[in-house]
Each structure stands twice: as structure tokens, then as C-alpha cells.
Amino acid sequence: MGEKTLTSRVETSLKNQFGVTISNASKRQVYEAMMRSVRDILMEKKFSYEQTLKQSRQKRAYYMSMEFLVGRTLRNNLFNLGIEKEAKEFLSEYDFSLDEIYNMEPDPGLGNGGLGRLAACYLDALTSNEYPVTGFSILYEYGIFKQVITNGWQQEFPDQWLDLGKYGLVYRNDEEVEVRFGGELEQVMTDTGLKVNHKNYTSIQAEPYDLLISGYDSSAVNTLRLWEAKAKTGFNMKLFERGEYSKSSEAEAIASSISKLLYPADVTNEGKELRIKQQYFFISASLQQLVKNHYHEFGTLENFSEHVALHINDTHPAMGVAELMRLLVDEYGYDWDKAWSITTKTFAYTNHTIMAEALEKWPVSLFQPILPRVYSIIEEINKRFCAWVIEQGKEYTLRDTAIIYDDMIKMANLSIVGSHYVNGVSKLHSDILVRDTFKAFNDLYPGKFGNVTNGIAHRRWLGQANPELATYLEKLIGDDFIKDLSGISKLNAYKDDEKVLKDLQAIKLTKKEQLADFIKETLAISVNPHSIFDVQVKRLHEYKRQLLNALHIVYLYHEIKYNGLRPTPRTFIFAAKASSGYQMAKNIIKFIHSISQMIESDELVREYIKVVFIPDYKVTLAEIILPAADVSEQISQAGKEASGTGNMKLMLNGAVTLGTMDGANVEIYEAVGEDNIVIFGLETEEVEALYAKGYKPWEYYNNSPKIKTVLDFIRTMTVGGMNFNFIVDYLLTQDHYMCLADFDSYVKAQERIEKAYNDSSKWMKMSLANIANSGIFSADRSVEEYAKDIWHIKRVQG
């Protein structure tokens, strides 16, 4: 695809859409024309690839996820298509900056954190490796939310991303489907047996939009199908005329709410109901389309699992198990046993957490009225499963394994029972699943559980986010690593080359200067690019322990101000969103901002430490922050982080991990060796033993002078008229994730970080080792394992 083709497409789009030439077009017009032109290029490639797929009749995978945090698409597509240079030169002829055009595109509001970014990385890697795959999710009108910080407090506003973000989407009105909610069930005996009729339901229209997924140097173009909810009947004039104003637009209101926001707060029953509707909406629409298309092509569903692999990404799509059963039994007339055989051969499930609150459970009283037929199918699945467990002599496990227990529907259990394979996302996480969280299931289903360690789209997180480093590496070791990240290990040959180490240091400084400029421009805060950039950017949750980081900063403040400590200057950089209904997480954000304010108001302390919280964290911000990091804070309580992928992106860009032996940190430790990572804190078994013994945070306060100093000081803190006694009270009475138990070890680890950083040659050797040994964490490796070991799909070249 060359310059002439892109040029002519953009010029034609400008003429047809706006009646202008590029010479007199506005920046927005050029942006829209670029988005449309690239979309059209991908549509043509997609058509060609689809023809090849139809001829090959190869098995395809379908990745179902509540979120896909894809990030900006224009640069990614130009990079993957190999036409970024041509686009830049073409636009510069007319005094347009390609970077300015890039910056017009909003991050699509389709995800929130690591779960969604992983899904996006996998679509990228699967397409780059020419595997046929489709993603399914919801077209959220307002995304998760736009985070604004006011006086240190998080506020949530609608993220109106579609105004400028819609131009990459393809509306497919030819594939609309109906999704049903509520109503009653009627059982009717027919010649072929008992039939269930669903009556008096509310009908919602699912309208599909496709986001085309490009691959690097690949003939494949795959699709992320996004469903938007619309009222099927629309506004009811008769009800309105009778004065029933609310009822007249009830269907519109239900539909509108379904695709409004990702993860509505579920602290109320209304919020829980909406989450149930969202999950069923996109699952039902997706499966209806898939089953219909398969039946149209083959005239049977007997071979469905031979051609279709369905993947449940966390528990949100778990209803797919019951919905596929509904379609097979109710719509296509299969008997239960045959339908169950097809279903369980088709589904696989990835678990992403051992956190109890994230292993979704829905009250029967809430679920049944919303989805009466789906509930009755789940009830039957549970009945048959429990009978089978009793036959195995394992009835004592039903408390843990039953799908319905204590009037709660356990979605993780439904996913496990309805899938042929279940995997965790790091070696440690998968080990915890089989020996603890799902031990009873592992005993019932030997061989069903396995591991696929997460991976990242290295072409985005190195090639696009850090072109300075990528270009340097290409010249030094060749460009093989772009296609296959294992090739980056060639960099190990230069670990003692002082020139290379200094070159890498210079590149890191460039990225730090770029981030410093961004912080100055957006937050009006000046930071020293020669200071240590200590970075913790991830979803705000107590188990991720941003609070532990904050406690250490308070410790440094106290030591600088009162005890003569003069540390190497350090800039602590945070970015994180707290869930809208998660008050403790919001309190921690306020605490971090107050620490920053306290430091800024102290002339002595601010020479040595600075705290910056960058609001509204998203992919585009990550692409600016991660390449600039010196220190990668991965400090979750051991045993709580399933894997993490931010740790991998930071490693790839030369940051040194400061972390616990948790999630993929364990595998980073194995990859780089103990000299190139800084580990602290209790390990998983020690955490479990301490919980079992009875964790008493007061004992740590009484026995650690450092902890006592910090907590006593926080008691005296008043910033902007606010005190933080509640932080101290929480830590001394609850401290669910053992910040105090790990605090002294964390302080020592931070001292080791500073000592290593001050030895410039040693630090850059550590940095190089992290870059050079990151190959195992490519998403290419991860998706290869899914494709071969779980989905059993093959590459298809167009």
C-alpha cells in the first residue's frame, strides 16, 4: 500500500465529504478523511482475507470480553500497514503535522484496565500472526468515565469519545439481532417433546458496529464487533396519548442504559440489574449471529465446535454457556445432552482474578425476572452437575462447586462447568487456582486447568510508544525483534558495552524530558528529568497498594524535613482511576494529592521529592509515561495480582521492577535474574500463613519505629483543612492487604533502588537486561499458546 493510494483516497474523501481539496481543508476535515481512508484500505484487505477464510473453512476463534482497551487506532493502523512514513510526508507537503492529526483521535471508550488492554493486545497479536479471530463487546457511548481531579478528589464525567472516534467504525445494519429481557415462560408439549415459549418480553435491538483490526506485516484483517442497544419498537405513541408517559418510552430507556457506560456502579440493585442486562445483551447478540451464520454455511450445528472456538475473558461473558444452550435447544431443536456436548467442546475460560468480589455472583431473585429462560437453563445445568458430583462421591464439594448456592448464581462456576479448558494468566496465579481457589474443581476435572502467561503487543509498546529506542535497537541488532520479540535477546551481547549503555541512558533521558514537557503543559508542574522517575500507573485498588507507595513518600518527607536525609531527587508518578462507587480508592487518590500539596509547600523537601498524579489514565497516556519510567512499581500483595501487563511494558522500555513476588513479577524475576530486579515483602505462602495465624497490624506499629513514625506523623497532617486519621485507623484496624507487614522491607528495597541508580553503569546494565530479556512476554507467544493448545486454530494467510 503506497503513498499514491493513500493520497488519492484522502483527496477523494475530502472532495466527496466536504467539497474541499487538501489545500483548503481544515485539520478536522483532514483527520476525518484520514480515518475514513485507512478504514477503507482495511475494508478491502478484510474482504480479501474473508474470501480466503471462506474457501479454507478453517476453524475461527471468538474472543468475548466486556472491554477492549484498544487505544488510538490511526497510528497503529498506519504503522501496521507500513504507510506511516508516506502519510507523514504527504501531509507535510500541505503543512499538516501527522502528530497533530493523531492527537485529534480520542481513545475509544471501550475499556478500563488490564483486562481490556490484554484483550486488545491479543487481537493485535492474533491478527499480526494471521489467526482468524473476532472480538465481541459493547459500543459504550460514554466509555468508563472521564476522570477529572478537583481539589484532590476524583470526579467522573461522561467520556464523549464517539464524536471524533466514530470514523473508524463500520455500521453493519444487515446483521442486527433481537435480544429479549423479562417476560414469562410457557411450557407446551409438542410432538417432538416439551417446548418452552418465551412471552411478554421486552425486545431490544442489537445494532452491530465493526472496528477493523490490522496486523503488522500481515495479510489478515480481523474484526472487533461492538453492539449498540436500541429500542426495537421505539416510542409508544398510544401509551403517551393515554398519559402513561414513563411507559411510553420504557423500551427506549432500557435500551439506552445498556450501551451507555462500561461498569455502572453495582452498589444498588439497579446497578446490578444493568450489569446483568449488559452482559447478556452482548453475549446473546454475538451468539445469535454466530449460530445463524454457521447454520447458513453448513446446514447443521453438529460440527459447531469443529469450526468455532468461543472464549470467555473473565466471568462477564459467562452467560454465553446458558445462551448457547438456549439457542441449540429452543431455536434449533437439539436434545439437552447433544446441546451440552456441543457447548462444552466450544467454550474455554480465562480466569483473571482470585479476588472474591471479582468472581461474580448474582442473586437469583434479581437474575430470574430479567432472564427467565436463561435462568431456567442455568438451573438445569446446576441440577445435572450437582447430581454428577454426588455420583462421584464428592457431594462435600458442592458448597464450592455448585453453580447456584445460597440463592446466588456463581458465574465463575458456570464458566468452569461449561468449558473444556480453564487457564490462569501467570504461573503463580494458575498454581493458586488449582491448589486453592478452584481446588475442588481441579479434583473433579483433572487436566482441565492450565496456564497461559499474559503478553503485550510489543509493536505498540516499543515500536510506536518508544520509536527512539526501537530505531536504535534496529540499527544495533537488526529489526527481527519487531516481528519476533525473542530476537531482542541479541541485546544481551552489549551488556558490558559502555557506549551502548550511555546511548540507552540518553534515550531514556529523552523520554523523561518528553514526559516532563507533557506534565508541564497539561498540569503546569515542573519536574526534573534528571531525577529518578518512579512510576506506579494502574487501576486504583487497595490490593495494588498505591497506599504503600504513599506511606513511603510520607516517610521520605519526614526524614528529609526532620532527620537530615538528602536522597537522590525522585519524582513519584501516579496515574489511576478508581471505580465510581469505590470510596476507599477515592480516599487514597485524595491522600496522594494531599501529600503532593504538602511537599510542594515545603521549600526544602520539594528539592528532593515530588509527587505527580496524572489524571484520566488511558492507553495514550501510558504510551507517554511508560517509556520514561526508571522504576516500575509492581507492589501488590503477594498472591493477589493474577499477572499484570504494565510490568511487562515497563520492562520492555528499560524500567527496573521494584516488586513483590506476585503475578508475572515472578516470571520477570526468572527472566532477568535477581541482580536486575528488586524484590521485597512477604511471599504468597507467608501471606496465607499470616492470615491463618491472625494478622494484627497493631503489632507492626508497636515493633517498627519507621511505621510508628509515619503513622504518628500522618495523624498530625492537615492539608487544605483535611486530616487523615481515617487512613491511620484503617491501617491499624484492618489493613486488608498488609501494607504495614511489608513496609520495612519496602523501605529497604527503595534504598537499594537508589543505591543502584546512583551507580550509573550498574543501573543501565540492569535496564539493558530488562529490555533484552522481555521477549517471553510478547503477546505473540501468548496467542500462539491459546491458538495451539486451547482453541486449536491455524494461521490463514490471505
Place the predicted regions along the sequence by residue:
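A conserved ligand/cofactor-binding region detector
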Residues: 1-798
